[in-house]
Amino acid sequence: MKILIKGAGDLATGIAVRLHHCGYPILMTEIEEPLTVRRMVAFSRAVYEGEAVVEGITGVRVQTPEEIRKAQQAGKIPVLVDPHAAIRTAYQPDVLIDAILAKKNLGTEVTDAPFVIGVGPGFTAGEDCHCVIETKRGHTLGSVIFRGSAIPNTGVPGDVGGYTIERLLKSTSAGVMEPVASIGDLVETGEIVAYTGGEPVYAKMTGIVRGMLQQGVNVEKDLKIGDIDARCETSHCFTISDKARAIGGGVLEAVVQFERIYRKYAVIVLAAGNASRFGSNKLLADVQGKPLYRHMLDKLAGLGAFPRILVTGYEEIAEAAEAIGVCTVANHQPELGISHSLKLGLEKCKSIEPEVKGVLFCVCDQPGLSLSTMMELIRLAVNRPGMILASAHGNRTGNPVLWDREYFSELEKLSG
């Protein structure tokens, strides 16, 4: 299973190391001039040094698909200068992790890969990604969020050794970065640790320089250029942090969960009813500015990890579904009832994926149904083999419903 990580800073590196240790092939992308403060524990350093070794694992700068392949075969992590991760189209990762840590989404979409993970604030699970990893220090650090967002950025760094804002080093002027202190040096309060744009930057506390931007990089005023650690443990400067390990653990948990369901379940949407009670084709009715059926297709677009089948007798709906890679089955006999659509969809599903473990059956007229709910039912199914799982509101169950393959033969006998 191929994994693409956007960003190669220290937190992204913590993620990459966790995944690498578990045998996943990794590709990381970076900007041309990385601004990683904790660069001694970041594979982004490979961009300007050619390679970077972090806890025995080597990250190496690459430029071509062949170099990516060779680096992975050699047990290394390739780092590609590709600010927008355009390599995604050719590389076709199974999992995409946005670990840029920009505190906002810079363009990642839930359709970028079968499984998309957003790291930190700026992402919403079920909208622009499948899950979010909490990055704020504290009780929930490293948590996997399958519905909603991470804690918003407060602008105040987490407590390390009893210090928060004081431990940050920020540029005093825009211009070229000129470090005076090196990573691992002990500095005193008031000591000059760097110059930015020719202006001195002073330490606000005593401690060890845990991170510092590289010589010659261009910075804006008030940019974080370094940090000081009051704990004065030199080894902390050259090893992955507790925060990065926790975040990496959260990502690993999400990836393993996804791997257990990847291509093992299917989604079938029933959209062939003649809407006799509605009086016309309700799936074409405008709901919140677009046809009703479009709401379901938007959800299906984010479920590319699974075979997706839509049963319909309407050409417009079929064409729209096929345009996003959804397989369609024609049902020109809606009068035979919903069971006919169900059987047509199940037959097609079994021809595509004979060993599918279960099917999530959905109806097409639920605009309020969320992608998160659909994913949750599939994730629950893997730990509840042989069961029928349904969504519910209060004590009332309804669609969608996930049927284990154990019941396929009975479903195929239904009528009406």
What are these regions, as identified by a protein language model?
Residues 335-405:
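Conserved beta-loop-beta/alpha segment of the NTase-like Rossmann-fold superfamily
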Residues 32-34, 263-315:
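N-terminal glycine-rich phosphate-binding loop and ensuing alpha1 helix
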